[in-house]
Amino acid sequence: MLLASLIASTLIAQDAQVTPLMSKDLADFPGKEGLMITLVYPPGSSDPVHRHNAHAFVYVLEGSVVMQVKGGKEITLMPGQSFYEGPNDIHTVDRNASTTKPAKFIVALLKDKGALVLPPVNPTSASVSASPKLNSGKK
């Protein structure tokens, strides 16, 4: 399944569990597709600086996560709270707020069909390479 290989390896937090939930072409939005995943960050886990070039909607299920986009304020999200990341945002902080408990959240992405989920961050903004875990099989 392409979605499973798409989620197989990434710059997502070390030891994070990534579970694909669904991928769907969006007929009412030509050239766009939706992708939904769950992530479980182990205690103390964090993500490197990244971007999605997509609309990303985050919803926390368990634990707490700290999020920030470049130019924005760092916020701590608890279960039931959400976070939005726009297509031009650079996600500078993405970490489990706890060093003792895991954090679980859902991410729903609205992106260009076939586009990389985690493309390289602009080298003038930050240094990050494309993610093989979420990008395998995509051009």
Language model segments and positions:
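A short, N-terminal "cap"/entry segment at the start of jelly-roll beta-barrel domains
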Residues: 1-35, 68, 84, 102, ...
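N-terminal targeting signals for Sec/Tat export/insertion, comprising classic cleavable signal peptides
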Residues: 22-54
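Extracellular/periplasmic catalytic domains that process cell-envelope and extracellular macromolecules
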Residues: 30-31, 51, 59, 76, ...
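Conserved hydrophobic/aromatic beta-strand scaffold that supports enzyme active sites
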Residues: 36-38, 57, 82-84, 107
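Histidine-centered metal-chelating micro-motifs
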Residues: 46-48, 66, 83-96
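Glycine- and acidic-residue-biased ligand/ion/polar-headgroup-sensing regions
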Residues: 52-71, 79-81
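Ligand-binding loop in jelly-roll beta-barrel domains
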Residues: 74, 88-115
